[in-house]
Amino acid sequence: VEGPQVGDLNLFQANNLEEKFYSGKTRALYGTHISVGDKMFSSFPYLRSLATITWDTLDWYGYDKDGGSVHDVIGTRCDPYTSKLISGSDYHHCCHSNITRALVKEKGLSKDEVEKIVHDVLNVFMLTGFTNDTKQYFMKSSPVRPGDFLEFFAETDLLGVLSTCPGGDCGSQHSSDIAKCYPLKVSIWDVDKKFLEGIKVSKVSSYNRNHGLTD
């Protein structure tokens, strides 16, 4: 709301935290980046749409000459373990840690319980891709500006956890306090019931989960 800022989003089914956003399956179904009309699927054994993107003020960006785009489901999330591996330092305000603290506070769980369910994110507003030559993951400064937003239609009761990334617009680095960061605003709206007519309820997978163990 004040400047260019990336956010890391975790989504959970509000009454069952084991059902959570599955970025890998969403990526397999839609591609490296998602936008209007794309659904955010949940983890096994549930595999259903948790939410659908209904409005994206950055949909004009598309893909640039480097193959970069916004709202990626290829990056994971900045985390203290990778930071420790690379830099040797303990940094506690990575997106993984921010989400962990928020869930501990909101749900009253231990950090050990929470770290088992914190998952790969939707990188909201983040501009990323793979390099043309080495196919390595890259980040560039996000084109997001105050007033831009990404809108979702929740297809079940959801718990959303959004971390303001310490990388700011992620044009330089993250996992440090160097980048300029700005607040992100979350709004929750009711839907006029007339718009819900004909919409099918998102149901969990009907697979019987036998896995060939019995005849």
Where are these regions (language model features)?
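Acidic, Ser/Thr/Pro
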Residues: 1-215
